Amino acid sequence: TATDISADALAIAAGNAREASLANVVFVEGRWTEPVQDRQFHLIVSNPPYVNDDDEALCALRFEPRSALASGADGLDDIRILAAECAAILAPDGWLMLEHGASQPAAVASLLSDSGWVDIACHNDLAGLPRVTVARRNVTQARSKPSETS
């Protein structure tokens, strides 16, 4: 199951899935976990927006919408939402994997820890930069539905 708030992004992803002969992917439009609240997953992989709103690189955007990259003053607004919401749709001991900026591993780990996640670890990308953090849902972590304000 793949979710995105953008119908255009989902159309591109669906085309990519067809080209890769991936017939078992379901594409659902909606914000983060909202469209899949009735499902349970063992793994969630997310490439959320993680760039600071005032990052100068955003001025050079030609193809991607700003909302696909920018996420608040520190670039972590969407990661905060995911840290809070994903436990509700993960199986016990399920895993969350988040892409983030190379300068953000400590902040992401702190957000996840504060939200009850365990076994938090950051991994380098192919360029050797710390860009992916994984965390396991603590079996005692609350499984409440996301708030309507997220």
Give residue spans per PLM region.
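S-adenosylmethionine
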Residues: T1-N138
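Flexible, glycine-/basic-rich loop-and-beta segments that form/coincide
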Residues: N138-S150
